[in-house]
């Protein structure tokens, strides 16, 4: 598939249907290697992200495609407001059920070790 064609039609779900989204990763890698194509892709990503931030009705599948393309080229996610990140897990846990049963054994397996923070920075 022509890389310029991919960039130009990434928004068109009729031309590049949603079931092809997973196969576009290799195309993104090739785009990232070409300086001109990656600049064109970044410009297009920024336009789509601006439309998203202005609530201009960007399809979530299209947004995910451009977010993936951006992260392949730039090496990090674009900080989108309101983007539903799939790896974010929010859960509340009541720890009392774990602590109350273990109250007599709390310090049995405690290991205290001094570590220099500069070793990890």
UniProtKB/Swiss-Prot annotation:
Keywords: Nucleus. Transmembrane segments: none annotated. It is found in: Nucleus, Nucleolus. Its main location: nucleus. One of its GO terms (cellular component) is nucleolus. InterPro entries: Swm2 (IPR031391). It comes from the Eukaryota. Belongs to the SWM2 family. This is Nucleolar protein SWM2. It comes from Zygosaccharomyces rouxii (strain ATCC 2623 / CBS 732 / NBRC 1130 / NCYC 568 / NRRL Y-229). The gene is SWM2.
């Amino acid at each position: 598939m022509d890389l310029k064609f991919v960039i130009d039609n990434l928004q068109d779900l009729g031309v590049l249907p949603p079931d092809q989204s997973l196969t576009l990763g290799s195309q993104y890698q090739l785009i990232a290697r070409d300086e001109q194509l990656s600049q064109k892709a970044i410009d297009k990503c920024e336009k789509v992200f601006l439309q998203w931030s202005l609530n201009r009705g960007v399809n979530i599948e299209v947004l995910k495609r451009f977010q993936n393309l951006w992260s392949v080229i730039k090496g990090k996610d674009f900080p989108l407001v309101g983007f539903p990140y799939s790896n974010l897990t929010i859960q509340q846990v009541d720890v009392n059920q774990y602590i109350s049963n273990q109250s007599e054994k709390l310090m049995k397996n405690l290991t205290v070790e001094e570590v220099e923070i500069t070793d990890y920075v």
